[in-house]
């Protein structure tokens, strides 16, 4: 086990929008180390969002992430011979990471032609409270609510 917690590295703001969130999204979209391709996808999707809404795409993205971020999640806790799903609050950094992960995961499962279209539409859906990534958050909250009886097994 690690002696100390690994230090958090500062996130470099992206050159186009000057936003840390966009940098994190680029890194989540990244596959096989092809960063320029990931940047092209993210910037293309954000341009499409701006085209469709006329609003600053970073604000749209942040609104979408706000709708995806979970407040609670369940973690497995072994007590005696039984494993309980214990609801715990999600730290802000983890909530952000989960939101980005779910956004990209469900973007990849969409049926539009290009990744740019998929990402743009998933961001717009999430910003409007629709889409698979928002449903995932609701499911996570339902799980936590269903297992509320085990909340006293907290860490």
Curated annotation (Swiss-Prot):
The keyword tRNA processing does not apply. One of its GO terms (cellular component) is small ribosomal subunit. Disulfide bonds: none annotated. The keyword Ribosomal protein applies. InterPro entries: Ribosomal_uS7 (IPR000235), Ribosomal_uS7_bac/org-type (IPR005717), Ribosomal_uS7_CS (IPR020606), Ribosomal_uS7_dom (IPR023798), Ribosomal_uS7_dom_sf (IPR036823). It comes from the Bacteria. Pfam families: Ribosomal_S7 (PF00177). One of its GO terms (biological process) is translation. Keywords: Ribonucleoprotein, Ribosomal protein, RNA-binding, rRNA-binding, tRNA-binding. GO terms for molecular function: rRNA binding; structural constituent of ribosome; tRNA binding. SUPFAM superfamilies: Ribosomal protein S7. NCBIfam families: rpsG_bact. Belongs to the universal ribosomal protein uS7 family. One of the primary rRNA binding proteins, it binds directly to 16S rRNA where it nucleates assembly of the head domain of the 30S subunit. Is located at the subunit interface close to the decoding center, probably blocks exit of the E-site tRNA. HAMAP family: Ribosomal_uS7_B (MF_00480_B). Part of the 30S ribosomal subunit. Contacts proteins S9 and S11. This is Small ribosomal subunit protein uS7. The lineage of its organism: Bacteria, Bacillati, Actinomycetota, Actinomycetes, Mycobacteriales.
């Amino acid at each position: 086990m690690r002696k100390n917690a690994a230090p958090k590295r500062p996130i470099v703001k992206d050159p186009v929008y000057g936003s840390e969130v966009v940098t994190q999204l680029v890194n989540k979209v990244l596959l096989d180390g092809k960063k320029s391709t990931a940047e092209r996808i993210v910037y293309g999707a954000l341009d499409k969002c701006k085209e469709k809404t006329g609003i600053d795409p970073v604000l749209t993205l942040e609104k979408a992430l706000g709708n995806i971020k979970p407040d609670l999640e369940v973690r497995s806790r072994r007590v005696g011979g039984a494993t309980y799903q214990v609801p715990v609050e999600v730290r802000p950094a983890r909530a952000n990471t989960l939101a980005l992960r779910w956004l990209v995961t469900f973007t990849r499962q969409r049926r539009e032609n290009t990744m740019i279209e998929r990402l743009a539409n998933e961001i717009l859906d999430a910003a409007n409270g629709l889409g698979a990534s928002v449903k995932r958050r609701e499911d996570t909250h339902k799980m936590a609510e269903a297992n509320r009886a085990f909340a006293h097994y907290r860490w």
